């Protein structure tokens, strides 16, 4: 349905939002063909970013702050907040909706009280912030109502990360039991093409069960997100002018 959105996480992340049968050209997204049949074409707005799990790998491999990716959740939960520390993960510039190609990654807010947990939490939060800031922008600029948000890929193992997204967007997340839904979807449509499935209704027989992440009232993370956006605007976006 229009407004249905899927976030795929891996080294980077991909966000696709169903925009219905009207093709839209948007400077902050790619427009792709999500589905086609004899009756209609369904289009999607798509956002690509090179760093999601890649940010966690950087914390592990380059900074040696964690021993394994799962530690990012464990250490983040040890602190009540990020202690005012923020990571702008512009390892290959800042993508949509900022578009600052020459931006470089940086920590902000480090003080004498900063510890490893704060740095790791700032890194993990920054991945969620990148996704949420894009979706918020698209909701506002395109008047899109996010009715159904699914997240799959390697980072769905991190429940702290998923809760951040759910809280910030104030929306329930659907987490499929199958981690790689992109490949599974390609398989289903391949089956349909070769007439093993007669129509889209038959696809319901192959639906994957979902778990849910429910938003909770957490004003602190919204305040943190606002501070992150202010840093991006002050030190990266306005510097382009």
What are these regions (language model features)?
Residues 1-4, 17:
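Conserved phosphate-binding catalytic cores of ATP/NTP-utilizing and phosphoryl-transfer enzymes
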Residues 17-241:
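Glycine/Thr-rich phosphate-binding loops that ligate phosphate moieties of nucleotide
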